[in-house]
Amino acid sequence: MTNEEMLQRVNELALHLEKEERDLYHDCVANGFHHIPGFAGALASLTVTLRDDIADDEARKSGRGSAQAAAKRIIKNAFAVQKIRENLHGAWMENGKQCLCDGFHAVILDSAIPGLPQVDDDLKKVNLAPILTPARKNDGMKLTLPTVGELKAAIKIHDAKERAQKKKAKDRKPLIWEFGEDLPWVNGNYLLDLLELLPGCTATASSYAPDYNAIYFQAEGIGEGILMPIRKQSGKTDS
């Protein structure tokens, strides 16, 4: 059994604790406490240990992040959410650069990633350059980005908690990554795609309505991209 599967089982057990014990459990987990007496304390200690192990595992793996896998995830999502827009159902070349977009995040790569599905030659290609132009002018906060390992670990921990609640796959919510007070929130899975496609990138929020306007990502010599934030006030996601 993997650490993620064990964490899911522990989360399931925690759901059945009495309220007082459940509150103790959540308090211990939030503060990283170990060795608290009682069943709730033991569960919390196990949860903290498993989370630490997952984070360590992902930190070790982070150097092998696959840009190709991230690109394929964008294409797969384009198939799912942009069913009638066949000109997004693959990668395409524009001015010698490779483009990917699903409507929520988009990337322009200086060098093409091999082995990706391609948009049919007969279809009119989307010109991403004008779409990225407003974001290139972003002059808001430079966002502090997580490492690939940190983000992967956070996603695994979040997903284990979602599965523990026995939700159907379509009802599970993605991890929301919060950059800070008065700063954008984003879909953690989409953020991971950009970090793997644009290693070492910087990210700049818009100074005007950062909760609505695209975040601009740039990695010198690799490419650039944008990510649409999540609408905070309604709880509705744009991504």
What are the roles of these predicted feature ranges?
Residues 1-13:
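Short, charge/polar-rich alpha-helical segments
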Residues 4-6, 39-65:
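Flexible loop/turn and low-complexity linker elements, especially glycine-anchored beta turns
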Residues 31-32, 90, 96, 222:
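Intrinsic-disorder/low-complexity loop/linker signature
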Residues 52-109:
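Intrinsically disordered, low-complexity linker/loop segments enriched in Gly/Pro
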Residues 102-105, 109-113, 117-239:
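C-terminal functional regions that serve as terminal interaction/effector modules
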